[in-house]
């Protein structure tokens, strides 16, 4: 079971990295030499950022399954609403005087 979870986590990371690479296609199109050069320069800057982001995604460790947050969530899911007593049918004397 743990190997399957690790494999699914790796596949999720690889899909995200692939999506990042697809969002930055190599620049093509007409234009002057300086326009093409600037497009390539900006593309190369984005490419370096994507590589750094992909590296951090791939190397970032998955949080442990029994982290304090997960334990807290499991504890909160086990809570139920208790039966509350019926509300009083008449107001106390001090509140009746305050309303008038």
From Swiss-Prot:
It comes from the Viruses. Residues 22-34 have a biased composition (Polar residues). Residues 22-42 are annotated as: Disordered. This is Protein Rev. The lineage of its organism: Viruses, Riboviria, Pararnavirae, Artverviricota, Revtraviricetes. It is found in: Host nucleus, Host nucleolus; Host cytoplasm. Keywords: AIDS, Host cytoplasm, Host nucleus, mRNA transport, RNA-binding, Transport. A motif (Nuclear localization signal and RNA-binding (RRE)) lies at residues 35-49. The RNA-binding motif binds to the RRE, a stem-and-loop structure present in incompletely spliced viral pre-mRNAs. This region also contains the NLS which mediates nuclear localization. These overlapping functions prevent Rev bound to RRE from undesirable return to the nucleus. When Rev binds the RRE, the NLS becomes masked while the NES remains accessible. The gene is rev. The keyword Transport applies.
């Amino acid at each position: 079971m743990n190997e399957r979870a690790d494999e699914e986590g790796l596949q999720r990371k690889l899909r995200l990295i692939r999506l990042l690479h697809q969002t930055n296609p190599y620049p093509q199109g007409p234009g002057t030499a300086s326009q093409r050069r600037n497009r390539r320069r900006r593309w190369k800057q984005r490419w370096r950022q994507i590589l750094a982001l992909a590296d951090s995604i791939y190397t970032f460790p998955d949080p442990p399954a029994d982290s304090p947050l997960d334990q807290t969530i499991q504890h909160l899911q086990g809570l139920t609403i208790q039966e509350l007593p019926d509300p009083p049918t008449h107001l106390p004397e001090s509140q009746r005087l305050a309303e008038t």
